[in-house]
Curated annotation (Swiss-Prot):
Positions in coiled-coil regions: 24-129
Assembly mode: Component of the NDC80 complex, which consists of NDC80, NUF2, SPC24 and SPC25.
One protein family per Pfam: Spc24
Biological process annotations from GO: cell division; sister chromatid biorientation
Protein name per the record: Probable kinetochore protein SPC24
GO MF annotation terms: microtubule binding
Subcellular location: Nucleus; Chromosome, Centromere, Kinetochore
Role this protein plays: Acts as a component of the essential kinetochore-associated NDC80 complex, which is required for chromosome segregation and spindle checkpoint activity.
Gene of this entry: SPC24
Similarity-based family: Belongs to the SPC24 family.
Keyword tags: Cell cycle, Cell division, Centromere, Chromosome, Coiled coil, Kinetochore, Mitosis, Nucleus
Length: 201
């Protein structure tokens, strides 16, 4: 197939010849050249449209790939955040349980000493002062700190039910309380996700 430049040149030559002689064959030749030029232009336009369509398909595929990568990054970030929260929550639960146990032991000791003061009418003044000092020592800064920690954990809506060996989770927005056993076959990941999904915000 002749190039565009060749077709134009042929038309120019044909025009020059036509100027010298008014012949039907020259008109036919010009019409043929024009038809070739139009056909070539149509083919070039079709090829351009095909290239544009391919580029659009590639663009769509690229956008889908980017979207998939973003979802993977989001899932990885969420999982990392939950796992990090799992460690913190496990430490919080252990510390909370230890604090509850410590408070129960302290309360038991205090009750024994108070009962001793009430029942023993023959206590001397020195014995009374000694026991009173022991009671005062029960409320030292460490004890006060543990009480504050316990209040903080409870303010988050997490409490331990040691009698039933379970965690109580309060949702302040809904006004509901959910329970979660401390010892079962559930994974730590599930426990953490379950607790955080139900804590009142």
């Amino acid at each position: 197939m002749a190039s565009t430049e060749e077709i134009v040149q042929m038309m120019q030559e044909a025009s020059a010849e036509f100027a010298e002689a008014d012949d039907v064959s020259f008109l036919d030749k010009m019409n043929s050249n024009i038809a070739q030029l139009e056909q070539q232009l149509r083919e070039q336009m079709d090829e351009s449209r095909q290239n544009i369509a391919k580029l659009e398909i590639n663009l769509i595929d690229t956008e889908k790939s980017i979207g998939s990568l973003r979802e993977l990054m989001k899932d990885a970030t969420d999982e990392a955040t939950i796992m990090k929260g799992s460690d913190k929550l496990n430490n919080l639960i252990d510390e909370l349980q230890a604090t509850e146990n410590e408070i129960q032991m302290m309360n038991s000791e205090i009750e024994k000493k108070v009962s001793k003061l009430v029942e023993d009418e023959d206590n001397t003044s020195s014995e009374y002062e000694m026991i009173s000092k022991e009671l005062e020592q029960e409320y030292d800064p460490v004890f006060a700190s543990n009480i504050l920690k316990l209040k903080l954990y409870r303010s988050l809506g997490v409490r331990l039910d040691l009698d039933n060996n379970q965690i109580l989770i309060q949702n302040k927005e809904l006004g509901t309380i959910d329970t979660l056993p401390l010892e079962d076959e559930l994974t730590e990941f599930f426990k953490v996700k379950y607790i955080w999904s139900r804590i009142g915000k």
